[in-house]
Amino acid sequence: LSQYGAVADAIKKFNYDYGLFLARLGYVVLCPDARGIGERRDEAFQKDEEEMFLRSTCFYLAHMAEPLGMTVAGMCTWDLMRLIDYAEERGQWRTDNLGCLGFSGGGMQTLWLAALDDRVKMAVISGYMYGYKDALLKLNGNCSCNYVPGLWKYYDCGDIGSLIAPRPLLIQSCAEDHLNGERGIANADEQVEIIRQAYRLFGAKNKLIHQHCPGGHQFHKEGIKENLERMEEML
């Protein structure tokens, strides 16, 4: 896809090529297209224009799913669980040390998958650790994959992240990420503190790493290699 100008520009801006980056570090990497993304977009709505390649059709999925008691986040999590099943049944790779890394919408999927499937032994969530009130309810224009009806009344992003404890977890937050909301990175810090309390209960506070990064909404490769090695030693 990098032959297309709009895609190449986005890869450069957001560092979207983190799958390739991990492969070059020696990891076996599976990079599935999520529902409504990439080859799983609904072309009937978007057509096949280059500038649409990295946009989603999650709105149309959510529009049909939510009246049926389903969510895009739930469907994506189910897909990723089936991907782990595939990796296990294939029998080609070790699956006792599985990790999951995602940025933005991929961070959302990593959050839910790691929280709900303990086969994920370590996780990296980049660009997705926000208090729902600031980031989803006060901001308009977020992707429909983010929304779980009524969830904000009872739980926040940090509560979901707490379910990952005591497994190694790295969270990246960017200081100027517009999705932090009006209070900036303090919104992310509050959610990480909720998670940190869970790690303290397990006596595993060293297994939670919170990396503050400069700039806007993007994945940061700086320090990833060293942090992954550190996290592997904790397994």
How would you describe each model-predicted region?
Residues 59-67, 82, 120-162, 166, ...:
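Mobile cap/lid helix-loop segments that gate and shape the active-site cleft of serine hydrolases
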Residues 193-235:
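C-terminal catalytic histidine-bearing segment of alpha/beta-hydrolase fold enzymes
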Residues 72, 104-107:
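Active-site loop->helix "elbow" adjoining a glycine-rich segment at hydrolase catalytic centers
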Residues 101, 126-127, 172, 213:
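Alpha/beta-hydrolase-fold catalytic nucleophile elbow
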Residues 80, 107-118:
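Short glycine-enriched nucleophile-adjacent loop
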